[in-house]
C-alpha cells in the first residue's frame, strides 16, 4: 500500500545488507509525522562514496599520473571511478579533475580512504555521515514529504494505513527485512521508499512526543527504589509511577519507553545520574548476558533482536543507550535532552538544583516547587513513607517537562534543524560545525568545490587578535547614544568575500582584490568567484528578514501558532549566523584557514577605529567602544535631567533631551554606514557610568525601552552571591541618578549589617563550577587528577561534603557553599556546602568579616572612582569630597 505524508526527521542511521548477493546500504530515518504518529523510513538507492583527485594535476595539466585501474582494484571499491568534473581544492586553491569512488558499505570507507591516500590520491568527501550525505545530495532538511510503501501499521497509525497485510506482525517483519531493515521496529508505522520518494517540505511544528523520567535510589547500595515516567503527547500527559523489585522497575520503565515511543527523553540531570545509574544497575543484574539486559535498558528505537543487542566495535548494541566521549548520551532513534543542561545553558542560574531552578522559573507557584523529601536520607525516607517518596519521584519527572516547555527548548531545536537543514538530533546535541557543515558542503557540491576532510588543515595557530576596545574614563556621562554594527562579522565576510575558496594563496596582486588592512591578506573579487561563506551568509540574512516580516504579519493577524514558528525560525537563523565566525576562525574546521579569522578581526578593528576618528573630528566625545559598539555623548542641553522626572517642567526637558539623543543617534548611523559596516542606532542612555575598566559599564536605557543596562560587573556573574548582586544594582541606580553619597552610605550600611549577622545566609551562597572524575576502580569521585590542590579549593571541598551527605554530584555542576569561620588553627577558609535547598535543615553560620571584606572589595572597585576604596568602605571614612566628580 502506497503512502504519502509530511514528516520531521528526528534522527537517522544506516545498515549494510545483501540484496541477492549485491551489497546495499539502507538508511533508517526515525520521524514524527505532521499528524502525530511515528514513522520509520527505510530509504534505499544511495550508494556510499568518496571523491579523489591527483594532486599533480590542475586546469592546464588534467591528465592524471596516478592509475585509476589501481583504484578500481582496491579492496572494497565497487566498480570504476566516475568522473565528477573539475573542482576547486581549498587545500591549495587549484582546480583539478575529481573522481567519485563507490565503496562497498560505510564501514569500509576508512580503509578505502587510507589505501587510496597511501598510493598518492587526495581523498575528499570521506568523513561525511551517510544520513547527512542523503540530506546533502537530495538537498533535504528535517521536514520532508515522503512517498513509499507501508510495511507496518501499528495501533496509533492512521486507520487508512491499516490493512490485513500491514497489521500482520510476522508479515511486516519479513517485508521489512526484505528491504534491509532489522526487523519490526517499535514505531507506529514503517515505510519503505527510494531516494526518489523524498522531497523537501515547508517547515511545520512537529507534534513530538516527550518522555521525562526520574529514579530514586538507595544511598547504601545504589539500588533503584522506585521510578516515574511522564509522557507528553500533544499536550496530554500520562503518568507512570513505578515500584516493586529493581528488575521489575527497569523492565516496566523500558516497556513504557518502547510502547509510548517518545522522540525526546528528558529528566533532570539524566546524563550524569539516571542514565549512568540504570546502566550500572542493569549490568549488575545481568553482568554476562546482553540478551537478559535488553528488557532492562532496551531504549533504542530498534527491534529487540539478537543483531541489535550484540555489541559492535567498541560500542554496545544499538538497543542500549550509549555514552559518547563528550559525556552526552545517544539513544538510537531518540534524542536525550537533559533539562538540567538546558536550564544551565539558558538561565545560567547561580545554583542548579531542581528546587532552585523551579523557584527561579515559578517563584510564586508552590505547585511548581519540588516536594520536601530529604534525598540524603533516601533509604530512611523510603522505609518510613514510600508513597510520599514515589509522589516526590513523579513530581521530579513532571518538572523537567515544564522546564523544557518554559524555555521552548524543543521548538528551538526543531527551528535550528530547519534552518541548518539537519536532522533534529544534530541540532539538539551536536556542535556548531556540524550545523554549518550541512549548509557549506551542499553549496560546495553545487559550486564545484572539493570537500576536504576535517582536521586536514593546520592544527596549531597563534591567537587571533580580538576586537578593538576604546579606553573609558571613570565617572558618569549624561545622555549617550549607542551605535552597533549590524551583524558585524557576517557583514565583513560578505563585503570582502572572505572564504577559503577565495583566499589568494600565491603572491599575485590585482586591483580587484579585497586586501585586509593589517596583514594585507588578499581575497579575489566577487566578480571572479563568489565565496561559499558570503553566499551562505547573504542567504541567511535575507531569510531572517523574511521570517521577521512573516512574524510581524502573523502578529498583526493574530495567528499565534504562525507567529511562534516564525519567531523560532528567525532566532535560529540568528544563532547560526553568529556561529560562522567562531567556526571559520577555528583551527579544526574543514573549510578553515588561519588567515580567515585574522582578516575578519582586522577589518572589524579598522572599521570601528576609523568611525571613532571621524566622530571625534566632528567634535563629539566617544565615551567608549567595544568590538562592535560605539558610545557617543549626545549634544543635549546642559543640565538636562538624567532620570525621568515627575514634574511637568522637568519632564519636558527630559523628553527634549531624549528626542535630541534619538535624532543624533539616527543621524550618526546614517552618515557613517558603508558596505560591510552598516551602523544601527541601537540604544539611547540618559546616563552612563564606568569606574574606568574595559568591558565594565552601566547605563539607564530610555530607548527603545526603559531598563538598566549592566555589563561586566558582579551582578552578571553566576559565581557572585545574591546580596552583592542586589546591592550593586541599587548602587548603580543611585550613581546614575547622581546620588553618589547615598550610594556609598547604603553600601556602608549593608557592610555593617553583614558584620552584625543581620543578613539571611541564603543571600550569601557562592556557587562555582566543579569538575571531577569517577574512579570506577575505587568506586569514588576523584578530584586529584583534575586539580593540583583540590583541598585548597572551596568548591571542591563543598562538592566532597555534598557527596558525603549522599547527594548527587555531576562533573561541571555548580556547587553552592557558605564561607564560615575556619576551624581553630586552620589557615584555610571555612567551607560548608549549601544543602538547604535539597535537604532542608538549619543554614550554616557565615564568616562575617569575610563577607564584609568581599562586599567592600567588589563595591570598592566602583566607588573608588569617587574616592572611596575598599579600605575606606570598611573603615567608614572617605578620602575626599564626592562633589568634584559631578
Task: Show the residue positions of the predicted features.
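Active-site palm subdomain of RNA-directed nucleic acid polymerases
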Residues: 366, 607-627, 632
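Active-site-proximal helix-loop-helix substrate-binding element of RNase H-like nuclease domains
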Residues: 261, 265, 275, 284, ...
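Catalytic palm subdomain of template-directed nucleic-acid polymerases
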Residues: 630-662
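Conserved RNase H-like, two-metal-ion catalytic cores of nucleic-acid enzymes
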Residues: 1-79, 184-269, 280, 285, ...
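N-terminal accessory regions of nucleic-acid-interacting proteins
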Residues: 92-203
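Active-site cores of enzymes that catalyze phosphoryl transfer or operate on phosphate-rich substrates
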Residues: 196-234, 520, 528-589
